[in-house]
Swiss-Prot record:
Biological processes per GO annotation: ERAD pathway; olfactory behavior; protein folding; sleep
Region (4 X approximate repeats): 191-255
Span list, region 3 X approximate repeats: 259-297
Disulfide bond sites: C105-C137
Family per similarity comment: Belongs to the calreticulin family.
Presence of keyword Repeat: yes
Acidic residues bias: start-end ranges: 378-391
Sequence repeat locations: 191-202, 210-221, 227-238, 244-255, 259-269, 273-283, 287-297
Compositionally skewed regions (Basic and acidic residues) per UniProt: 207-251, 352-377, 392-406
GO cellular component: endomembrane system; endoplasmic reticulum lumen; endoplasmic reticulum membrane; extracellular space; fusome; mitochondrion
Signal peptide: 1-17
One function term, GO molecular function aspect: unfolded protein binding
Organism: Drosophila melanogaster (Fruit fly)
Name of this protein: Calreticulin
Length: 406
């Protein structure tokens, strides 16, 4: 039995050693800008990131991240790391987003680039490998982007994944596996999964409509037909409008001046509309004709859809109308369990944030009440002063009147 335990330990050790962390960024260093490069692409008004835990948090140090700090700005900053390929291994991309400003319109996603990226010139048209994360703009756009580059073209997921739109921290996780399957998680809970070939248009369709097939001329796809024996009733045809029988010519109507008087028209209660014969089940009905399909000669399978041959840069390339988003807990790895363990901390983070925010909201509520009361008291004082002034004026008028009488 001893050898069995040894094998298990060795296997566990090998599994541990094989796990790779390509990038881990918790922004726990005041010198974070030494490793992150701002873009200087011309023609863009870029904003700056600032290191902060925000105005409400669970842990003032652990919850520090980089926050967008200027409204109506582009943001473009990236960090390079040792390049890698995810061939035959899972790829896990994870990070946290906190829209503390109650965002109205702005991106919260990351992009992964290969090593050819010029970080100082990164911009919206820079080619990337993967784009992943939340995007919000008004009530109509609240989605999680999952976009892959394939043969020089960006392909969007065909499914709609809704993102979180509150003010608290949320972890977003993308897992891509060598069997061409994927998962998207928010706060460690799976919100979408499937097959890369099924949910993206990387490849031509497997089947296409047979271009040589046509519907037979004698194919009857009418479920019902008019009853040939049904006849229109003789009294069916009635005018849609008739003269109002209750209308009378006005007394001041002058036929010579106004022309011949005609009563106004009203809807005819006996009007039945256009007559249609009754419908019968069609005895020759064959159902809806389905265009036959054939194998698409342009379809070429690819069992490497998951593969990213080179990744070595992660960047934030965003536009935000209202700033205040905090990014943190960036992790790129092939270890699914490690990512899950890191994301599990979100519950504690959210609990602490909510507790602090509720306390702040209560303080603000009391402050607003006090200010409202002060404003109300001042209005009452002003009204009293006005009443006193009116009394004084009335008294003066009375004194003047009495004086005049004397």
């Amino acid at each position: 039995m001893m050898w069995c335990k040894t094998v298990i330990v060795l296997l566990a050790t090998v599994g541990f050693i094989s796990a790779e962390v390509y990038l881990k960024e918790n922004f726990d260093n005041e010198n974070w800008e030494d490793t992150w490069i701002y873009s200087k692409h011309p023609g863009k008004e870029f904003g700056k990131f600032v290191l902060t835990p925000g105005t409400f948090y669970n842990d003032a140090e652990a919850d520090k991240g980089i926050q967008t700090s200027q409204d109506a700005r582009f943001y473009a900053a990236s960090r390079k790391f040792d390049g890698f390929s995810n061939e035959d291994k899972p790829l896990v991309v994870q990070f946290s987003v906190k829209h503390e400003q109650n965002i109205d319109c702005g991106g919260g996603y990351v992009k992964l680039f290969d090593c050819s990226l010029d970080q100082t010139d990164m911009h919206g048209e820079s080619p990337y490998e993967i784009m992943f994360g939340p995007d919000i703009c008004g009530p109509g756009t609240k989605k999680v982007h999952v976009i892959f580059s394939y043969k020089g073209k960006n392909h969007l997921i065909s499914k709609d994944i809704r993102c979180k739109d509150d003010v608290y921290t949320h972890f977003y996780t993308l897992i891509v596996r060598p069997d061409n399957t994927y998962e998207v998680l928010i706060d460690n809970e799976k919100v979408e999964s499937g097959n890369l070939e099924d949910d993206w248009d990387f490849l031509a369709p497997k089947k296409i409509k047979d271009p040589t097939a046509t519907k037979p001329e004698d194919w009857d796809d009418r479920a019902t037909i008019p009853d040939p024996d049904d006849k229109k009733p003789e009294d069916w045809d009635k005018p849609e409008h008739i003269p109002d029988p209750d209308a009378t010519k006005p007394e001041d109507w002058d036929d010579e001046m106004d022309g011949e008087w005609e009563p106004p028209m009203i809807d005819n209660p006996e009007f039945k509309g256009e007559w249609q014969p009754k419908q019968l089940d069609n005895p020759n009905y064959k159902g809806a004709w389905e265009h036959p399909e054939i194998a698409n000669p342009e379809y070429v399978p690819d069992d490497k859809l998951y593969l990213r041959k080179e990744i070595c840069t992660l960047g934030f390339d965003l536009w935000q109308v209202k700033s205040g988003t905090i990014f943190d807990n960036v992790l790129i790895t092939d270890d699914v369990e490690l990512a899950a363990k890191a994301a599990a901390e979100v519950k504690n983070t959210q609990a602490g944030e909510k507790k602090m925010k509720e306390a702040q909201d209560e303080v603000q509520r009391k402050k607003d009440e006090e200010e409202a009361k002060k404003a109300s008291d001042k209005d009452d004082e002003d009204e009293d002063d006005d009443d006193e002034e009116k009394d004084d004026e009335s008294k003066q008028d009375k004194d003047q009147s009495e004086h005049d009488e004397l």
